[in-house]
């Protein structure tokens, strides 16, 4: 028994799911912009400054009896006159905290740590982590990352327009925007709820997602083009459905085998790679979904709407003449 699956018949459902996901993502980024003046919670990589993370020394008797309070640490930081700052309590036991401030020199950092120790108790020197990035470097990293994204989008449009046609490229880019927006929306929500910050690794993840998604879309589009050449009389809806059926197993298998190591990294990897892996997991799932259910159905809808014949290239005409 052959499994027949039609993406065209349920395309309004697929588009509705994507529309809801995109609207939710825009909403989360809007709330984040209202609260943080940025659509995502930026790390030091982008805004510059100093971040100090340290834990209480629980080997000292009674030092970790009471959990840390954000307000207590915030008052200490404010009294040091270091400017606007952000305090986060980390871990379930609430014995670790981080403080992010404008850029501090060595003396200012030492005074701040001394003041914190006198207020909240002994700090474990082995857990002190200090990161400092200048504001100019942060801006340069952000600009370079955005430029890389724009160049990748432009390159994809040019490549797909040459290999296929412009409408193929247009809907492939629409699918990529879908993947990037949904991934960013999830991280906007994580930034609001859990204080998750995005750094330069997040931009690397977005570029990787773009590459994965466009590759998946090209596989389906290539099958559509070949089927159009072989069956010129078929309706574009039939061709797209048949093409998706032919490539569905490949798309699912590729996505699953890619996700397995990423899930392992997310569950067992270090804190640096955890959210990088999560971004890739979300993006790859979205990329597979958009390639199968969004890019292909949009192409069929557009061709039907404009009354374009299914033949995509002169090459198809030549094949017919030779036969």
UniProtKB/Swiss-Prot annotation:
Protein localization: Cell inner membrane
Pfam families reported for this sequence: Sec_GG (PF07549), SecD_SecF_C (PF02355)
GO molecular function, one term: protein-transporting ATPase activity
UniProt cross-references to Gene3D superfamilies, sorted A to Z: Multidrug efflux transporter AcrB transmembrane domain (1.20.1640.10)
SUPFAM superfamilies: Multidrug efflux transporter AcrB transmembrane domain
Chain ranges passing through the membrane: 13-33, 142-162, 170-190, 192-212, 248-270, 280-302
Keywords for this protein: Cell inner membrane, Cell membrane, Membrane, Protein transport, Translocation, Transmembrane, Transmembrane helix, Transport
Membrane association type: Multi-pass membrane protein
Domain of life: Bacteria
InterPro entries in the cross-refs: SecD/SecF_arch_bac (IPR022813), SecD/SecF_bac (IPR022645), SecD/SecF_CS (IPR022646), SecD_SecF_C (IPR048634), SecD_SecF_C_bact (IPR055344), SecF_bac (IPR005665)
NCBIfam families: 2A0604s01, transloc_SecF
Stated family: Belongs to the SecD/SecF family. SecF subfamily.
Assembly and oligomerization: Forms a complex with SecD. Part of the essential Sec protein translocation apparatus which comprises SecA, SecYEG and auxiliary proteins SecDF. Other proteins may also be involved.
Name of the protein in question: Protein translocase subunit SecF
Native species: Picosynechococcus sp. (strain ATCC 27264 / PCC 7002 / PR-6) (Agmenellum quadruplicatum)
Gene name tied to this protein: secF
